C-alpha cells in the first residue's frame, strides 16, 4: 500500500497529491454532514430508505489499532434495548419486588417520603429525573457510557421503564408521543362522540347541497337538480299546495337552503337581470318592459333578449326547469362533468353531453342543432331544418 502511494506521489507530485487528498476529505465531510442532517433519507441510487447509523466517527474518537495491519480502532457503541419491547408477561421473568431493607435505603437517600407513601405512587408520579436528580442519559450521538447510578435500589426502580426512556436514534417511529397519554381514558366517550360530529361536519362540507324533501345530500347543484327532477317532480305535480310543503329539515344547513327555495323546490328567483341590471319593468338595454327568465337551481335571472333567446326558445324554457350556463347539466346523465363536451339545443336550451347522445358525437355540428325532444315536438320547424333550408 505504501509503495502504491509513493508511486502516485512521484508521478503527480507531493503537493498535487496533498491537494487531491484534501479535496477528497472535504467532499466526504460535506457528504456525511448532508446525510446526517436529512436522515432518514431515500437513496436515489439504490431506492432504499436509509436509516440512521453510527459509522461516522470523528478524529477525536480514534484509538490505536488492536490487530495486525490495523491503523485505527474506534470504541464500540453501547447496546441498548429497543423501546418497542414489552414487559414480560411470564411471572418467572417479571422484576423482583423490592425488599424492606431496600426501602430503608430509599428512605435514607430521600427517594421515599417518611409518611409511608408506596412505591407504586412514586412510580406513577413524575420521573425521578424531574424531581431534581441529574439526568443519567447522555446524548445519543456521543459515545460515552451511561454513568452508574449511586445505588442498587434506585437502579431497580428505574429498570422497568428504562427501555422506554432509552430512545434509540434508529427508532424513527410515529408512536413516540403515545407514552404521554398513558392512563388517560376518562374522555373516551366524549372523544367518540366528537369523532362522529366531525365526520358529519366533513360530510356536510363534501356534500353541501341537501334535498329539502328527503334530506339526501349531493356534492354539486346539478346532481341535486337531477334528483329533484327524477325523484320528486312527478309527486309534486300531483299534490296540492298544502301537501307539497317539505317536512322538517334534517340539519341546520337544510333549513338555510329551505329559506332560499320556494314551495315547489325551485330556487327563489332574483328580481333583476344579471346582464343589464334591469327588472321586469324595464330592460336597460332596450328600454322596454320584458319578463325575466330565472334559473331553477341558483335563482339568477335574465331578460330573454339579454340571453339571446329566440321566440321558440323563450316558449320552451317555460315548460321545464331551466338552468343557467353555470348550473347547466346533461339532460341524459344529469351531471355537469366535462362541461366542454356539453352541446346546447338551439330550440329549448337543454344541454347534452356529445358522448351521451345516440349516436354519439366526437365534435359539435356546424350551424344550429336540435335535440330529439324538439325534433319530435317541432318537427320541420326545428332550428336544424331551418338552418338547412336557409343554406
Curated annotation (Swiss-Prot):
List the SUPFAM superfamilies: beta-beta-alpha zinc fingers, FYVE/PHD zinc finger
Where does the signal peptide begin and end? Answer: none
> Which domain of life does this protein belong to?
Eukaryota
Which biological process terms from the Gene Ontology are attached to this UniProt entry? apoptotic process; apoptotic signaling pathway; chromatin remodeling; negative regulation of myeloid progenitor cell differentiation; negative regulation of transcription by RNA polymerase II; nervous system development; positive regulation of double-strand break repair; positive regulation of stem cell population maintenance
> What are the subcellular locations of this protein?
Nucleus; Cytoplasm
* Pfam families per the UniProt record, alphabetical: DPF1-3_N, PHD
Positions where Phosphothreonine occurs in the chain: 176
The subunit structure is:
Interacts with the nucleosomes, in particular nucleosomes bearing histone H3 crotonylated at 'Lys-14' (H3K14cr) for which DPF2 has high affinity. Also interacts (via PHD-type zinc finger domains) with histone H3 butyrylated at 'Lys-14' (H3K14bu), histone H3 propionylated at 'Lys-14' (H3K14pr), and histone H3 acetylated at 'Lys-14' (H3K14ac). Interacts with histone H3 acetylated at 'Lys-9' (H3K9ac), histone H3 di-methylated at 'Lys-9' (H3K9me2), and histone H3 tri-methylated at 'Lys-9' (H3K9me3). Interacts with histone H4 acetylated at 'Lys-12' (H4K12ac).
Similarity section: Belongs to the requiem/DPF family.
User: What disease does the Swiss-Prot or TrEMBL record associate with this chain?
Assistant: Coffin-Siris syndrome 7: A form of Coffin-Siris syndrome, a congenital multiple malformation syndrome with broad phenotypic and genetic variability. Cardinal features are intellectual disability, coarse facial features, hypertrichosis, and hypoplastic or absent fifth digit nails or phalanges. Additional features include malformations of the cardiac, gastrointestinal, genitourinary, and/or central nervous systems. Sucking/feeding difficulties, poor growth, ophthalmologic abnormalities, hearing impairment, and spinal anomalies are common findings.
Q: What is this protein's record name?
A: Zinc finger protein ubi-d4
| Annotated organism of origin | Homo sapiens
Q: What is the lineage of its organism?
A: Eukaryota, Metazoa, Chordata, Craniata, Vertebrata
Its gene is DPF2
Amino acid at each position: 500500500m505504501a509503495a502504491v502511494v509513493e508511486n502516485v506521489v512521484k508521478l503527480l507530485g507531493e503537493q498535487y497529491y496533498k491537494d487531491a487528498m484534501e479535496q477528497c476529505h472535504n467532499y466526504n465531510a460535506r457528504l456525511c454532514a448532508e446525510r446526517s442532517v436529512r436522515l432518514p433519507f431515500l437513496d436515489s441510487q439504490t431506492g432504499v430508505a436509509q436509516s440512521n447509523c453510527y459509522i461516522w466517527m470523528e478524529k477525536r474518537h480514534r484509538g490505536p489499532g488492536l490487530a495486525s495491519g490495523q491503523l485505527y480502532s474506534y470504541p464500540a457503541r453501547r447496546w441498548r434495548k429497543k423501546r418497542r419491547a414489552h414487559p414480560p408477561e411470564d411471572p418467572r421473568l417479571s422484576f423482583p419486588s423490592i425488599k424492606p431493607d431496600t426501602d430503608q435505603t430509599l428512605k435514607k437517600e430521600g427517594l421515599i417520603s417518611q409518611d409511608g407513601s408506596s412505591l407504586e405512587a412514586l412510580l406513577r408520579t413524575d420521573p425521578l429525573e424531574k424531581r431534581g436528580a441529574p439526568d443519567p442519559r447522555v446524548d445519543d450521538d456521543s459515545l460515552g457510557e451511561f454513568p452508574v447510578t449511586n445505588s442498587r435500589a434506585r437502579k431497580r426502580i428505574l429498570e422497568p421503564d428504562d427501555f422506554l426512556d432509552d430512545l434509540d436514534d434508529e427508532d424513527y417511529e410515529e408512536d413516540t408521543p403515545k407514552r404521554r397519554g398513558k392512563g388517560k381514558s376518562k374522555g373516551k366517550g366524549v372523544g367518540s362522540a366528537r369523532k362522529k360530529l366531525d365526520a358529519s361536519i366533513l360530510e356536510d362540507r363534501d356534500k353541501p347541497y341537501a334535498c329539502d324533501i328527503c334530506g339526501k345530500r349531493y356534492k354539486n347543484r346539478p346532481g341535486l337538480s337531477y334528483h329533484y327532477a327524477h325523484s320528486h317532480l312527478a309527486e309534486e305535480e300531483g299534490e296540492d299546495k298544502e301537501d307539497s310543503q317539505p317536512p322538517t329539515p334534517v340539519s341546520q344547513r337544510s333549513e338555510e337552503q329551505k329559506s332560499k327555495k320556494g314551495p315547489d323546490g325551485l330556487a327563489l328567483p332574483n328580481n333583476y337581470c344579471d346582464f343589464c341590471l334591469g327588472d321586469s319593468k324595464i330592460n336597460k338595454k332596450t328600454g322596454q318592459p320584458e319578463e325575466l327568465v330565472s334559473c331553477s337551481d341558483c335563482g339568477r335571472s335574465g331578460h330573454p333578449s339579454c340571453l339571446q333567446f329566440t321566440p321558440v326558445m323563450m316558449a320552451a324554457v317555460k315548460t321545464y326547469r331551466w338552468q343557467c350556463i353555470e348550473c347547466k347539466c346533461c339532460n341524459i346523465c344529469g351531471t355537469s362533468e366535462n362541461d366542454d363536451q356539453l352541446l346546447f339545443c338551439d330550440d329549448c336550451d337543454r344541454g347534452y353531453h356529445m358522448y351521451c347522445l345516440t349516436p354519439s358525437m366526437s365534435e359539435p355540428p356546424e350551424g344550429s342543432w336540435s335535440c330529439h325532444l324538439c325534433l319530435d315536438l317541432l318537427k320541420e320547424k326545428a332550428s336544424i331544418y331551418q338552418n338547412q333550408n336557409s343554406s
